[in-house]
């Protein structure tokens, strides 16, 4: 093969179905040879292309890509649309190429995740001038095994090839990458600085910044410390007012960042921050509850318990309870203490009783959530539970939502392990939470993808549109590794966590070279931006699988970056760092 649009080409505008194609023992080379293996189709006719095998092919040079899969071919062509084409089970093995612009290109479509199960194994491409792997729109389950470009192994996240990592720690590398992308922390989470010039108060910022805080504690770096401290400095005034916080919303999401603020305040204590922390705790004292005593997720989500909300509220309550009891914030006074606080460093018997009551309430809430969201058929936990069984997304008999969203399960597992961080060793009900953690994470292992080591976005559905998702995968990995380190879990959980972390690096971490010559950044890819249920004014958020698949996927979602940092710090305790890859 010396010329043409491709050495092996499947399809075009009228491709329809193609399957069981074998190409092997071929030689190709020409500056006019556009591609080695090309699959092209679009939504005009749809169809399914599958079971394509290319092996033992030697290529001198090609003009564009060694492999290109394009299901968005001729997107402006005037024709009837809406027929989704699927491409899957494509193998390229033992293929060499000495010159090209790209290694692998995949052009998906925005509507569906229709390109998947693509394998490149034992392939070597040299003199790739632009990018080893370029992906556009949606695709998943892309597997690279012993795939070398310009002498370096390439993972399936589409990394640029770099000679050496600028940091030994992936946690430092990600932290400094995020600081470079977002110079001011009040604008994390893709916040529009024009619409929100004062920034946003959001649980999302707190999660990522707390991961950075722990990176600082592990590795130092005054720049990291200064960066994380800018958030409370800018968002909380000296009189304790928080920009964007509305007590009357009774929104558990707004409490999560208090967990970060409480810890960070020790670096530069400020009275205004302490006043704000009391206000957040006061919300928890007065938060509306279901008839069984579990917090509503938000005022607008009345009578509803979400796995998300357990993480947003209960770890902060557990951590802050001893301090708040000393400060006189009790259920009886609704968080507004009368008189002077005790100056004694020790709790009185009455205060100890109040503190134990707080702990009991925390364990009661998480165990009730466990019972109400657990699905015996799958061994998983549903995203949410409507205690009145009346919401449009809820099962009328059980009150449960339809599916298990992986990130909701991630919130639930992180809530458990963080509650254990602060429940005293001698607290009578501590073992209940440890047992729950074992049960929850064992279920996670049961649903861990054996090929990639990570997890799918909707855990209880097998469908070609489902995709491996990074934020939940980072959460589970963090909990598996930390739980094993602290002795809550046996070594099988640690091994699952190690497998998962390597899967994160191979499938989700992309290295981005910088045109200005500064240090290459890394990105966490394939994170779903959001998924929720309702409220009534948002009927499209109905908890169906189609709904979950409709939410956008993006890079560097802070809800994944924070847990990635925590998972990385756990792996570093086991001796793993960037030198394991470079």
Predicted regions and their residues:
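Long, well-ordered core segments of solenoidal/helical folds
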Residues: 169-188, 226-244, 275-294, 335-339, ...
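CBM-like carbohydrate-recognition segments
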Residues: 132-134, 163, 169-206, 218-225, ...
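Oxyanion-binding "anion nests"
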Residues: 22, 28-33, 411-460
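Extracytoplasmic mature domains of secreted/periplasmic and thylakoid-lumen proteins
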Residues: 247-312
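Acidic/His metal-coordination segments adjacent to aromatic residues that form catalytic metal sites
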Residues: 236-243, 291-299, 388-402, 455-465, ...
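Aromatic- and glycine-enriched pocket-lining scaffold segments that form the walls
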Residues: 294-385, 393, 409
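Extracellular/periplasmic carbohydrate-active domains that bind, remodel
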Residues: 1-162
């Amino acid at each position: 093969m010396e010329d043409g649009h491709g050495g092996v080409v499947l399809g075009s505008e009228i491709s329809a179905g193609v399957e069981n194609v074998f190409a092997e023992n071929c030689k190709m080379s020409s500056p006019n040879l556009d591609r080695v293996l090309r699959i092209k189709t679009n939504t005009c006719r749809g169809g399914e292309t599958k079971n394509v095998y290319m092996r033992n092919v030697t290529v001198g040079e090609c003009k564009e890509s060694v492999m290109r899969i394009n299901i968005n071919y001729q997107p402006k062509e005037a024709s009837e649309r809406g027929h989704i084409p699927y491409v899957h089970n494509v193998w390229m093995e033992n293929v060499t190429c000495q010159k090209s612009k790209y290694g692998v290109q995949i052009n998906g479509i925005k509507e569906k995740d229709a390109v998947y199960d693509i394998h490149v194994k034992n392939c070597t491409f040299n003199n790739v001038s632009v990018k080893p792997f370029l992906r556009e729109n949606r695709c998943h389950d892309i597997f690279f095994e012993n795939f070398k470009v310009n002498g370096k192994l390439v993972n399936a996240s589409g990394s640029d090839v770099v000679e050496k990592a600028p940091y030994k720690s992936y946690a430092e590398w990600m932290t400094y990458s995020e600081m470079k992308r977002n110079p001011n922390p009040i604008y994390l989470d893709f916040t529009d600085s024009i619409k929100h010039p004062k920034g946003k108060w959001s649980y999302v910022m707190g999660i990522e910044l707390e991961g950075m805080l722990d990176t600082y504690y592990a590795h130092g770096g005054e720049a990291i410390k200064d960066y994380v401290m800018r958030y409370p400095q800018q968002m909380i005034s000296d009189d304790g007012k928080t920009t964007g916080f509305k007590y009357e919303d009774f929104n558990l999401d707004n409490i999560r960042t208090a967990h970060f603020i409480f810890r960070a305040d020790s670096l530069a204590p400020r009275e205004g921050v302490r006043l704000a922390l009391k206000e957040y705790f006061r919300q928890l004292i007065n938060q509306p509850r279901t008839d069984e005593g579990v917090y509503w997720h938000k005022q607008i989500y009345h009578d509803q318990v979400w796995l998300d909300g357990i993480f947003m509220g209960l770890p902060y309550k557990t951590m802050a309870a001893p301090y708040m009891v000393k400060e006189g914030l009790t259920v009886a006074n609704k968080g507004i203490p009368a008189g002077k606080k005790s100056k004694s460093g020790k709790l009185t018997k009455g205060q100890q009783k109040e503190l134990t009551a707080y702990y009991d309430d925390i364990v009661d809430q998480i165990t009730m959530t466990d019972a109400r969201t657990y699905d015996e058929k799958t061994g998983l936990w549903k995203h949410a539970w409507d205690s009145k069984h009346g919401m449009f997304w809820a099962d009328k008999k059980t009150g449960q939502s339809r599916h298990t969203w992986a990130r909701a399960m991630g919130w639930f597992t992180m809530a458990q392990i963080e509650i254990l961080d602060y429940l005293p060793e001698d607290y009578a009900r501590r073992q209940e939470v440890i047992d729950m953690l074992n049960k929850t994470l064992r279920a996670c292992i049961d649903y861990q993808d054996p090929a990639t080591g990570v997890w799918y976005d909707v855990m209880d559905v097998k469908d070609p549109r489902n995709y491996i998702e990074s934020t939940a995968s980072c959460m589970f990995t963090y909990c598996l590794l930390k739980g094993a380190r602290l002795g809550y879990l046996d070594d099988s959980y640690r091994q699952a966590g190690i497998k998962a972390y390597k899967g994160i690096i191979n499938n989700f971490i992309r290295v981005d070279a910088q045109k200005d010559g500064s240090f290459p950044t890394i990105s966490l890819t394939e994170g779903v931006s959001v998924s929720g249920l309702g409220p009534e004014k948002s009927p499209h958020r109905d908890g169906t699988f189609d709904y979950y698949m409709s939410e956008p996927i993006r890079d560097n979602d802070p809800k994944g970056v924070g847990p990635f940092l925590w998972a990385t710090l756990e792996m570093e305790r086991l001796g793993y760092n960037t030198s394991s890859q470079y």
